[in-house]
């Protein structure tokens, strides 16, 4: 599950594209998609919220579980997609076998309370109808709902095996977010990768791909 302003990954520069193809080579089937309002999906980006992405994710889980009849379902989320994936794993703890979180953006709630979003600023007490974030029109409902998201509270309801990977050079989402997840989720393991940024485009990407594959296979 991709992050804020992201997509499912259409070339090898994107971590989800690289990870999907690597897992396929390891015999693990993958299902990637664009959230509603992003890239090739229908809808408007300004209507996107974490809740709308959770609803999208529910449809994907239903498709994998009911239509594809997958015996095991693993969720992988990057950045905001990590927040969505974890909340879905908690909601579907009886279905989701394992969870992988890549630089999960739990800090989006703190940012919304401060009135900041990737460099853009707004009044958090009087949220405007829309906010421009690097050329993307983000609806006010995104920030209103983000301020009250029960991110860590929900995380405590998933007890399945969880892999947390965060780059120590991430200047978008602080590694402290993954550290906190690791503390409140006793069945989780945390890998902090020196030199890797938020997009995992550094020299240690292959190591990250292997970490995920080994975690899912074992």
Question: Which stretches of residues belong to each language-model region?
Answer:
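The alpha/beta-hydrolase serine catalytic core
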Residues: 74, 83, 90, 95-180, ...
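Conserved catalytic-core motifs of eukaryotic protein kinase domains, centered on the activation segment
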Residues: 10-12, 41-45, 112, 175-176
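Alpha/beta-hydrolase fold nucleophile elbow
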Residues: 68-79
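Alpha/beta-hydrolase active-site loop signature
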Residues: 5, 35-39, 106, 197
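Glycine-rich "HGGG/HGxG" loop immediately N-terminal to the catalytic nucleophile
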Residues: 34-48
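Alpha/beta-hydrolase active-site loop
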Residues: 47-67
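Short, surface-exposed "cap/lid" segments of acyl-processing enzymes
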Residues: 1-25, 30-34
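Aromatic pocket-lining residues of Rossmann-like dinucleotide-binding sites
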Residues: 23, 88-89
């Amino acid at each position: 599950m991709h992050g804020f302003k992201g997509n499912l990954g259409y070339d090898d520069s994107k971590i989800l594209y690289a990870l999907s193809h690597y897992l396929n080579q390891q015999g693990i089937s993958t299902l990637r998609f664009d959230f509603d309002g992003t890239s090739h999906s229908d809808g408007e980006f300004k209507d996107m919220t974490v809740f709308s992405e959770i609803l999208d994710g529910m449809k994907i889980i239903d498709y994998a579980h009911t239509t594809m009849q997958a015996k095991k379902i693993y969720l992988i989320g990057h950045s905001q997609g990590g927040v969505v994936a974890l909340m879905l794993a908690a909601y579907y703890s009886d279905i989701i076998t394992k969870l992988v979180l890549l630089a999960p953006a739990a800090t989006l709630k703190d940012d919304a309370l401060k009135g900041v979003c990737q460099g853009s600023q707004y009044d958090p007490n009087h949220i405007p109808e829309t906010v421009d974030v690097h050329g993307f029109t983000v609806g006010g409902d995104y920030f209103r709902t983000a301020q009250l998201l029960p991110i860590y509270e929900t995380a405590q309801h998933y007890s399945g095996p969880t892999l947390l990977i965060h780059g120590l050079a991430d200047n978008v989402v602080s590694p402290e977010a993954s550290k906190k997840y690791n503390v409140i989720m006793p069945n989780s393991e945390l890998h902090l990768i020196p030199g890797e940024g938020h997009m995992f485009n550094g020299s240690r990407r292959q190591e990250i791909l292997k970490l995920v594959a080994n975690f899912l296979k074992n």
